[in-house]
Amino acid sequence: MSSRALRKLQRQRQTELLEEALDSESDEDDEFSSTSGKKVVNVFEILEKENNAINSEAEKSVSEEEQDEPLVEGESPIVSTNKKAKNKKKKKKQQKKKKVTGKRDLDNQSSDNEKLEGLESSKNIDDDIDEIEKAAAELKLKYREQDQVEHVAGVEESATIPLDKELDEKLNKLLGVNISMLNPDLEIRKIFGRIVEKRSVNARHDNLRRKRHVLVQPQEGWPPLVRSGLGMKLTGQSQDLECFFEITQSRAYQEVQETFEYYVQTYDPNNLLMLLRSHPFHIDTLLQVSEIIDQQGDHELSAELVARGLYAFDSILHPRFNLATGATRLPFAIPSNRRLFLCIWRYLQSLQSRGCWRTVFEFCKALLQFDMSDPYAIGTCIDIYALRRREFAWIIDFANYLENSNKISDTPNMLYSSALAMFYVHGDTTDTRASMLAAFERAPYMLSELLDTLNISFTKSSIPSPQDPVQELHSAMYALYAKDSWSDPTVLAFINSILEKETVTLHDVEGQFAELTENLSRRVILLNEQSLRKFLPQRILQGTILSFDPLPPDTYLSESQVFGRDISRRIASFLSDYLSRAREVNENEEEPPAHEFDLPPAEQLLQQIESEVGEESEDGTPVMTRLRSFFGSLFTSTNSETEPAEESTEEMGQGD
C-alpha cells in the first residue's frame, strides 16, 4: 500500500472516531432526557419501530450464516467497508429517539464491531508500514551508492576548474564595493556622532524622499540637472559576469566639448567660467574650473565642483551598473570613460583632507575594478588607505591574490603592507617575522628610504639601492605616504628587533625598466607632488600635459581620433611648417614654381603630406585615403560657397 493510501486511511479513521464521539454525546443527552423528563409520544415512533424490526431481522440472518465460522483475533465477524460504516452512522442518527434498552443493545454491538475493525485496520497499517520501511531502505541504499558516484564525479570536475577562474572570482570578491560607505557623511557621523550634522530635521526628511544615489549625494544650491547630454550603455558581458560599459555623449554635448577645448587654448579662465554658467554639468569644464579655484585657495568650492561632476555621472548609471559585484568594467581606452576616472580621483583628493579613509578606500576599489590594467596605478596606494582604515584582513587577502597570480612584483608595496597588517592582527609571532623578513629580502630597494623616514639605523650590511626608475619611484612613494602607519612605537620596536636579532640577507634586484611605465607616469602626474616629478621621462615633461585628460593612452576608440596619435602629430607638424612657409612666401612676394599651378591646391597639399607622412600609420591605418576624402569635400564646399559670391558681384557690377 502506498503512503498516500495510508494517509487517506488514517484521515478516514480519525473522521469516524470524531463522529462516533459526537454520536455518543448525543445519545447520552437523549438518554438523560428520556429518563428525567416525561415521556412524549412521537408520531414517527411507529415507523422507527418497523425499521428497527427489519434491521434486527437482517442482522439476525447475517449472524446465523456466520455462526459456524470460528472467531479469530484480529478478524471481524462482519465485512466492514466505508459504505457500510456510513450506513450504520445514518441508522444511528435515525434511531436517536428509540427506546433506551434497544439503543443500548445496538450501541454495544456496534462498538464491538468497531473494535474488531480497528484491530484489523491496525494490523493492515502495520503491514503496510513494514513494506514502506523495506522499500525505503532499498531506495536509501540505492541513492547512497549514487551519491558516492556523484561525489567522486564532483571532485573530479572541481579539480578540472581552471585556477584563473578561481582567482578572478576571488578578485571580484575583494574589489566588491560597500555602496553604503561611498557616502562620506555616514563615515563622519560614525566617527563624530550626529552633532556634526547642521541640517534640520525637515531637511533630512526631504533627503529621504529623494532618489537614492550611488556615487555622491546632491547638495542644496546646485542647479537642477535636467539633461546633461551624457549616457551609459552596456557594451558586453563575459562568461564571468563581467559587465562592460561605455559613457556616451550627445551631439550637443560634443559641441560644448569643442567649445571647451577652444577656450582651454586661449588660457583665459573667464571664458571657462562663462561656459560653466551656461552648461553647469559639463564634466571637463567643472574639473578645469575646480583646479583653477583650488590653486587660488578655495578648496571647499573646488571640491563642490568636482562633486557636482560626479553627480552628473551618478544620474546616468546603467541599471546593470553594480559596484558591489566587483565585476563592473569601464575600459580606460574610451575617452568618455576616462572622465569618470578623473572625476573620482579628484573627489578622492578632497575626501582625504576630510579624513574619510573608508570612503576613499571604497572608491579605490571601484577604480581598480573599472579597468584591470590599473591605468591610475591604484595598486600602489590602496594598501595605504586600507592601513589607515585598519582593513588588515583585506590587505592580507589582496596580497595573497597578487602572490598567487604572479603580480606581486608589480606592487612591492603590498609585501610591506601585508607584513605590517599581519603584525597588527597577530602581533610578534614567528609567521609575522617571516613575512616581514620576506618583504625586506624580496624588495630591499624600498627598505633604505623607509628606514630613513622612520629614523631607524641598520649597520649589519649595506642595503641595496634601486636599480631602475620604477624601483626608485616605489621606494619614494611608499616612504612618503605610508610613514604614518609605520610610526607606531610598537611597530618601530618590532622592526628594530628583527633587524638586530634576525639574519637579514639583502641582494640587488635587477632592474627591468629604462623609464617609468605609462600607468606610473600617469599616477605621478595625478599626485602633483613636486618631489616625484623628477622620475617622469623627459619626453613627458617636454610635452603638453592636459589636466582634464592626463597622459591619454596611445590607442583611441573615438571617431575623432581615427588617424592615431602618431599620424595626428606628424600631420599637425607638417601643416604648421607648410603654413609658415606659405606666410613667408606671401611676405616676400615670391611666386611659387610654375609646375605647382598644374594641380589643384588640395592635390598639391595632399601630395606633399603623403611624401612627408606616408600612406599608412604605424598600426596600418590607411591615412591618406581618408585624408583625400576629407580634403576633397573641404575644397568642394569652399568652392561652392565662393562661386555664388563672385556671380553676385558680377551681377551687381552689371546693374550699376
Curated annotation (Swiss-Prot):
Stretches the record annotates as Disordered: 1-35, 51-122, 634-656
Major localization class: cytoplasm
Biased composition (Basic residues): 1-11, 83-101
Subcellular location: Cytoplasm
Basic and acidic residues composition bias: residue spans: 51-63, 102-122
Function: Component of the ribosome quality control complex (RQC), a ribosome-associated complex that mediates ubiquitination and extraction of incompletely synthesized nascent chains for proteasomal degradation. Within the RQC complex, rqc1 is essential for the recruitment of cdc48 to incompletely synthesized nascent polypeptides that are ubiquitinated by rkr1/ltn1.
Family per record: Belongs to the TCF25 family.
Protein name: Ribosome quality control complex subunit 1
